[in-house]
């Protein structure tokens, strides 16, 4: 997700001075597309998405707390997982709170500055998720294919470097998006066909030919769908053979369980992301394409803790030990006994 914006500069040009009257210059605000126009349905949707948002934040916070407080989880896999949880909190917090407030106030307005800010954080955290999922696939590859050298290869210095590298690439991607959008000086309309400031939707509003916009969207889908997934699938292609050679069924189950959870998250993240971007160019109804956007920005971060961690025995044991320490600190009996 970090390299394609550079190519945008070959496509994006300032709007010509002979623009037609319907083209708008100096736009100060945009109008977001709501999930429903029924005023009676707004409180129901607001309550639903508030519940999903709270589940997402609390679930990911539990993972971060469990990993940081338990020495048994101070391993590269859980270190990357806790950073993925942090990125998921930021990712969903970029769009969902604004959407809930809009539902409650029956407002669809977002300022130009607010739109660019939301877009920047959206790209930042989406790219962080993208990078971290790839890093986690590499971590599983090293753990299974090179178990004897795992601690040497995945040392704390390399783990920290991979996190910092992911962050700075994501930050660069975010700022390049900002620079690209600042090149747009006029728009055909102020209605964004999504519930947040999606970069692809903003490109649709610019004055130049929409054919280039559609090509850019397909290019984005190809780059950020095919290439990262290909890298992850290649890692798992290398992983399958060593797993099949594991002598014990328990060892095979543990390896497949870890890899299966990660692959489920990967498929959910990249699949809904690709569908969301491509459907915006294919489907005639904006509300139909918004279903994929909701899955991508709301449902996926909510399901990640359940898919990857909260069903993990190590995480459950860590949470149990943490609960026991909290109760002991209040001079009560521990919640559970861990032998």
Curated annotation (Swiss-Prot):
An example Gene Ontology CC term for this record: plasma membrane
Protein family (similarity comment): Belongs to the G-protein coupled receptor 1 family.
TM regions (residue ranges): 44-64, 73-93, 118-138, 158-178, 216-235, 256-276, 290-310
Cystine residue pairs: 115-207
Gene transcribed to yield this protein: OR7E24
Protein's organism: Homo sapiens
Protein name listed in UniProt: Olfactory receptor 7E24
Glycosylation site residues: 23
Assigned keywords, A-Z: Cell membrane, Disulfide bond, G-protein coupled receptor, Glycoprotein, Membrane, Olfaction, Receptor, Sensory transduction, Transducer, Transmembrane, Transmembrane helix
Entry keyword rRNA-binding: no
């Amino acid at each position: 997700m970090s390299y394609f914006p550079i190519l945008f500069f070959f496509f994006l040009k300032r709007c010509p001075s002979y623009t037609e009257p319907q083209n708008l210059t100096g736009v100060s605000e945009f109008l977001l597309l709501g999930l429903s126009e029924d005023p009676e349905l707004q409180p129901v949707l607001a309550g639903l998405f508030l519940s999903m948002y709270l589940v997402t934040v609390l679930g990911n916070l539990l993972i971060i707390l469990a990993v940081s407080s338990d020495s048994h989880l101070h391993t590269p896999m859980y270190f990357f997982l806790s950073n993925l949880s942090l990125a998921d909190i930021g990712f969903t917090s970029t769009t969902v709170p604004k959407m809930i407030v809009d539902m409650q106030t029956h407002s669809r307005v977002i300022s130009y500055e607010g739109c660019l800010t939301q877009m920047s954080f959206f790209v930042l955290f989406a790219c962080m998720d993208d990078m971290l999922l790839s890093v986690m696939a590499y971590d599983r590859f090293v753990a299974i294919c090179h178990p004897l050298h795992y601690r040497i290869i995945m040392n704390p210095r390399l783990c920290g470097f991979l996190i910092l590298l992911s962050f700075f690439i994501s930050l660069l991607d975010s700022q390049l998006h900002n620079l690209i959008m600042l090149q747009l000086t006029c728009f055909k309309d102020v209605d964004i066909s999504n519930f947040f400031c999606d970069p692809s939707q903003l490109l649709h509003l610019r004055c130049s030919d929409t054919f280039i916009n559609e090509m850019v969207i397909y290019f984005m889908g190809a780059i950020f769908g095919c290439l990262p997934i290909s890298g992850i699938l290649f890692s798992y292609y290398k992983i399958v053979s060593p797993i099949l050679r594991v002598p014990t069924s328990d060892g095979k189950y543990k390896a497949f369980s870890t890899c299966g959870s990660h692959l489920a998250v990967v498929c959910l993240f990249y699949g809904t992301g690709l569908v969301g971007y491509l459907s915006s160019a294919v489907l005639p109804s904006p509300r139909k394409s918004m279903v994929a956007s909701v899955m991508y920005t709301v449902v996926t971060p909510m399901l990640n803790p359940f898919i990857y961690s909260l069903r993990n025995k190590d995480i459950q044991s860590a949470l149990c030990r943490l609960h026991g320490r909290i109760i002991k600190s209040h001079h009560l009996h521990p919640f559970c006994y861990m032998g």
